[in-house]
């Protein structure tokens, strides 16, 4: 979205999501004079699946690095959950590659119980769904929101397999990579990356998040003393979906103050 001559900003969704997960935020940001690159990460949405099943943090970092190196200016990166992990590791391990970071409900330390809930949801229906209504019901059960009647929006998150059933629009092999990395090992890596950050950084947390705790926020802010922080009321881990207007306003306010 927006004029390619404008400063670039890359949106990276979370694991198991697609580029459509940002609601109206990406389009709103484009109207503020930014060139928005809204990405389907490897193995998600319209992007290819990895033949070798490489959905490690290293793999996603290579992808973001390749995107940043193609742009004429260092981009701002807005990353939710897995997208935020990618952004943090990329800039922390390659200082100066990115202009600024907006991390959405992710810190080096995450809550194992919340991560387990995500993985349970992602692996719950390997056989798929008969109807889009069933998909909508599953999403509502996970998010705690009222079931959507916008089935076209739901359709963007699934594909139909050979038997005509609806399955999620991401490679199931991704779960194996997530389990293989280990939360503790990844937390050590990300905290080291955080300590290296000098780029302007905004951490956005969903107040009701079961992924990012108050302790996780405190430890991150101690490591990144210049980071700004906002706690979004009535939002869970899915901040952009739960409170899209508040989230969009926070992103726009932050990026419009960048030098």
Positions of PLM-derived features:
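Active-site loop/oxyanion-hole signature of alpha/beta-hydrolase fold enzymes
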Residues: 30-31, 37, 41-78, 249
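Helix-rich cap/lid subdomain of alpha/beta-hydrolase
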Residues: 109-170
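Structural signature of beta-strand start/N-cap positions in the alpha/beta core
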Residues: 8, 35, 74-76, 97-100, ...
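Conserved HGGG/HGGXW glycine-rich cap/lid loop of the alpha/beta-hydrolase fold
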Residues: 1-46
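Catalytic histidine-centered segment of alpha/beta-hydrolase-like enzymes
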Residues: 232-248
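Conserved hydrolase catalytic core segment
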Residues: 74-112
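Conserved catalytic-core motifs of eukaryotic protein kinase domains, centered on the activation segment
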Residues: 21-23, 47-53, 113-114, 214-215
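Conserved serine/cysteine hydrolase catalytic core
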Residues: 162-222
């Amino acid at each position: 979205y927006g004029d390619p001559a404008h400063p670039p900003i890359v949106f990276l969704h979370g694991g198991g999501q697609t580029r459509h997960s940002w609601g109206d935020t990406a389009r709103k940001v484009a109207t503020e004079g930014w060139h928005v690159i809204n990405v389907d990460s490897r193995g998600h949405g319209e992007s290819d699946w990895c033949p070798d099943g490489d959905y490690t943090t290293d793999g996603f970092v290579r992808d973001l690095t390749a995107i940043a190196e193609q742009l004429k200016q260092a981009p701002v990166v807005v990353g939710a959950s897995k997208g935020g992990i990618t952004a943090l590791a990329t800039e922390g391990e390659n200082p100066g590659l990115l202009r600024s970071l907006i991390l959405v409900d992710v810190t080096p330390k995450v809550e194992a119980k919340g991560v387990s809930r995500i993985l349970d949801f992602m692996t719950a229906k390997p056989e798929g769904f008969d109807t889009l209504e069933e998909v909508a019901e599953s999403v509502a059960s996970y998010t705690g929101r009222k079931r959507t009647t916008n089935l076209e929006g739901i359709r963007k998150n699934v594909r139909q397999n050979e038997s005509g059933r609806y399955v999620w629009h991401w490679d199931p092999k991704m779960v194996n990579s997530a389990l293989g990395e280990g939360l503790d090992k990844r937390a050590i890596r990300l905290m080291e990356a955080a300590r290296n950050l000098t780029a302007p950084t905004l951490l956005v947390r969903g107040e009701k998040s079961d992924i990012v705790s108050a302790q996780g926020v405190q430890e991150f802010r101690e490591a990144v003393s210049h980071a700004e922080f906002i706690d979004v009321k009535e939002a869970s881990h899915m901040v952009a979906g739960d409170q899209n207007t508040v989230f969009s306003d926070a992103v726009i306010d932050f990026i419009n103050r960048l030098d």
